[in-house]
Each structure stands twice: as structure tokens, then as C-alpha cells.
UniProtKB/Swiss-Prot annotation:
GO terms for molecular function: orotate phosphoribosyltransferase activity; orotidine-5'-phosphate decarboxylase activity. Pfam families: OMPdecase (PF00215). This is Orotidine 5'-phosphate decarboxylase. Its EC number is 4.1.1.23. Pathway: Pyrimidine metabolism; UMP biosynthesis via de novo pathway; UMP from orotate: step 2/2. It comes from the Eukaryota.
């Protein structure tokens, strides 16, 4: 496990080279939560209701904004207001995967206006290094307007059965991240990837990529579509900094109670991991 994962969020925030990652760790420490809720609902009312009810217990809300049947200005302004009210970040799980010119327009232009409201986005590197370069270029442009308030996670691994995000794909994800550290804040992965070495890159002392792990569910081991779940304790134990839980929270009989349970288990696992550090 990367040595950075043994440090507290406060310690990592104090020295983190990425401004958004620094803010995220500060939020996690202040609220005592490492939970990201995946709010896979289909209407603006459901999304904003969940964000408001669960906001006090989460560090991040993850959206799939293109599944909303009624996306509008109300969606954007509502999410932004609730993120400010409850102090959480917004992660749009868009999984950009196209040529650079196209993803730039998808991110900063177009109907969904993602750059306007999503602090965090993610991408697959299947198109090659150009996708990371293109998104980083957009975020650093003089007219972008959001600067250090935006960051990218590279989809380096997946928790679904038979995932092809392994081996050289994962290694290349780390290579590309190291070239764009100001914008790439970390990975969606099942473990820390900071110690990955390749022919073109190697770890540096100041490197501290944030790990988001999907497929966290307290009461289920999987579904019929290939998803494989793990518990908050097992995910944090393997090196996750932030756990992503979806149906285990939003589809629970009492989503607020479920969010509190994930918060408790995730935080206890984090404290056990960092020990006396």
C-alpha cells in the first residue's frame, strides 16, 4: 500500500499539490466522512431531495446527469446551492471517452454544461493520452473561469466482473496522470496506484493521488449484471480514500440512516488504517 494512505486526511491536505484534492481532504476531515453517494435517480426532484437529505453525511455526490429526464437550470442551480449548504463536492460520472476535440466540447460546452457545476469529472484513457491532455488544457485556459476548483479522476480500474481495465491500461493511466498532476487529482481504482512504475514514469515523493473505489455495499455481494461489491472496511483497508456507494444508500428503506451507517463504517475503517499517524 502507498505510504501516503497511512497518513491522515489533514496531513495529506497540508502538503497536497492539487488544490481540489486538498479541499476534498479538508471537507472529509471536517465532516468526518469519506462517503461518495452515487445518486443514480432519474428526476431533478429526486436528485435534489437526496442531495439535501444526505448532504450532511457525505463528502461527494456522484451524478450521472444524462439519465435525468428533466435536466434544466433548476438542476444545476439546485445542486450548486446544496453543495454550498452542506459542504460537499459534485462528481459527474461522465466517463469521457472520445478524441480530445470532442471531449473539450462535451466538458465545457454543450447542453449539460458540465464544467459549470461539476467539481470532479472522470475519463477513460482508451482514446490515448490526448484525452487527458485535452481536458487539462481546457481547465487551464485563461477563459475557463473555474481554475483550481475543477479536477479529473482517471478510470484506472473497475469493480465489474471481467473488467478489461487491468495491466497496461492501468499502468498507462498512471503515466498520463503523472504528466498532468495539476488537473488529475487521482483515480477510480480498487487500490492505491502511486507505486506503479513503468518504462516512462516512476513515483515521486510529492505524489499523492486520491483513490475513489466503487462498488461498496454493506448488505450485498453483487448483482445480476456483473457488479461485485465490497464493504466500506474492505475498500478502505485496500487503500480507498473515498468509497462510492449507490443502491446501498439511495435504494435503502431509509436513505438517511443508510448514509449514516456508511459514514460510520467508512470513518472507522479510515481511523483504523491511519492508526496513530
Amino acid at each position: 500500500m502507498s505510504s501516503k494512505s497511512q497518513l491522515t486526511y489533514t496531513a495529506r491536505a497540508s502538503k497536497h499539490p492539487n488544490a481540489l484534492a486538498k479541499r476534498l481532504f479538508e471537507i472529509a476531515e471536517a465532516k468526518k466522512t469519506n462517503v461518495t453517494v452515487s445518486a443514480d435517480v432519474t428526476t431533478t426532484k429526486e436528485l435534489l431531495d437526496l442531495a439535501d437529505r444526505l448532504g450532511p453525511y457525505i463528502a461527494v455526490i456522484k451524478t450521472h446527469i444524462d439519465i435525468l429526464s428533466d435536466f434544466s437550470d433548476e438542476t444545476i442551480e439546485g445542486l450548486k446551492a446544496l453543495a454550498q449548504k452542506h459542504i460537499f463536492l459534485i462528481f459527474e460520472d461522465r466517463k469521457f471517452i472520445d478524441i480530445g476535440n470532442t471531449v473539450q466540447k462535451q466538458y465545457h460546452r454543450g447542453t449539460l454544461r458540465i464544467s459549470e457545476w461539476a467539481h470532479i469529472i472522470n475519463c477513460s484513457i482508451l482514446p490515448g493520452e490526448g484525452i487527458v491532455e485535452a481536458l487539462a488544457q481546457t481547465a487551464s485556459a485563461p477563459d475557463f473561469g473555474y481554475g483550481p476548483e475543477r479536477g479529473l479522476l482517471i478510470l484506472a480500474e473497475m469493480t465489474s466482473k471481467g473488467s478489461l481495465a487491468t495491466g497496461q491500461y492501468t499502468t498507462s493511466s498512471v503515466d498520463y496522470a503523472r504528466k498532468s498532476k495539476n488537473f488529475v487529482m487521482g483515480f477510480v481504482s480498487t487500490r492505491p496506484l502511486g507505486e506503479v512504475q513503468s518504462e516512462v514514469s516512476s513515483p515521486s515523493d510529492e505524489e499523492d493521488f486520491v483513490v475513489f473505489t466503487t462498488g461498496v455495499n454493506i448488505s450485498s455481494k453483487g448483482d445480476k449484471l456483473g457488479q461485485q461489491y465490497q464493504t466500506p472496511a474492505s475498500a478502505i483497508g485496500r487503500g480507498a480514500d473515498f468509497i462510492i456507494a449507490g443502491r446501498g444508500i439511495y435504494a435503502a428503506p431509509d436513505p438517511v440512516q443508510a448514509a449514516q451507517q456508511y459514514q460510520k463504517e467508512g470513518w472507522e475503517a479510515y481511523l483504523a488504517r491511519v492508526g496513530g499517524n
